[in-house]
Amino acid sequence: MGSKSIFNYRRGIFFGLIFLSIVIFFTMAHPLVPYDGDDWLNLSILRKAVPMTGAYNPIKVLPETLFPLSGLVAAYVVYPLVGDYISAISLTSALVMAGLISLYMYLFFKLVERWFSLSDYANMMVTALFFLFHFALFYEKSSPVPYLFGSGNLTCIYHYVIPALVNLCVVLYLASFDIAHEALNLTPGRRSVLLFCIYLAIFSNALSNIILAAYVGSVLVFKFFAHLKDHGGYKAFVKGNAFYIGIIAVWLLALVFESHGGRAHDIGRSMSLSGIGETGKIFLSMIGRISVDVAVVGVLTIAAALYSSYRKKDKGYLLIGMYLGTSLVSALYLLLVCAKASPGYIGRSDVFISFIIWTVLLMALSLAYVFKQYGKSVFVGPLLVLFFIVEVGLGGQGFAQSTMGSVPPSVCYEIDYNLIEQIQAADREGKTEMVLRVPKGDKHDNWPHPTYMGGKISRTFYKHGLISRNIKIKIQPDPAMNEQYHIAVPK
């Protein structure tokens, strides 16, 4: 009992450190601060928790329920404790991210444990490196570095990063059974939780749910050919894999829902070869931004794993086959969807993750395989962890901020409170209408503080208890605020 408690105690410390590091990262180093019109809209607008035909985002059940619920928790639970509204939103969002990322790392740890039976120490080294790869994957000398847990603003954290994390958690959980060739014989409670998570994963984002679909589709292809090899019938295959076939069917249904939504209608562009070509160029440019250090370590690790697998005549080729299958499906899907929507999407780390994560997983699992086959090689684990911790801290201009236009979070904080003070002053004076001064934005609609955001920010402040009534707000761009806060006017 003593050794087992120490074993669990070490794991608790390890994952506790991951959780704490993410909380610190997203509250102090790179705070998740609301800033633009989308943030103020999505903090309070709560949708039905089912896909809705004809809605602007028909299938975004996960982000469009979690974000406003987090906003309510921030306003009515965290805000009274910390005494700062914007900090409450930042802390709540950081806790959500820390919880999901910690779960993601734990499920990866359990997958490695189940597949390779590594020592606790070796598994922690592999998991720590897997965690660091999400930060060290890209490198830029002269501009802020993107990372796989980052995005363009707080809304996109909830709408892209979190859906990707939920999909990855489901994939890692399913993979722990598939690798062991075990059936999903779960208790009713666990089965219901799994189905709920699959529901949220599929009905989250059409650029993120490909993670689950690519994995399940690849598993089905492998099982199908194995079934044919055993001279099995089609009916038996369908019956034996009804669960995974059902996941693909629901995913396809979700795509149909999404294709008839308001956002798809607004895009209104047809697929074209030029669009696919432009998307492909941006896709290749993203690959070109991958850190040389990560690429070298990845190539050496994968090569060592392949060499060992070849010598031992084991089934390591199945992992490569799964990697190629998931990567190919994800790449083709993203190229086509982004070419239809906007080629620039694929140049975002929160979208590119749906493709590149398979390579990151292959690198980490290959390292685990090498540690399993060559026990003494574990000594390089701490060296690699230290190396990438240092690399993460050496980025040319640090990590990209999760704010629109990469405005420093401290400046966003000051502007937010300027807006809050203006609106609360009008509320104290009993006004039902007001003019809200905001920084001057772009020429189209004054983004990131668009002229149409007045009703949205008023509704959010009213729902969160900052004002006593809804106020009709007219947005007035003011260049003086740009000078005051040293922000450039967007072009």
Annotate each predicted stretch with a short phrase.
Residues 9-26, 126-133, 193-198, 242-251, ...:
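Alpha-helical transmembrane segments
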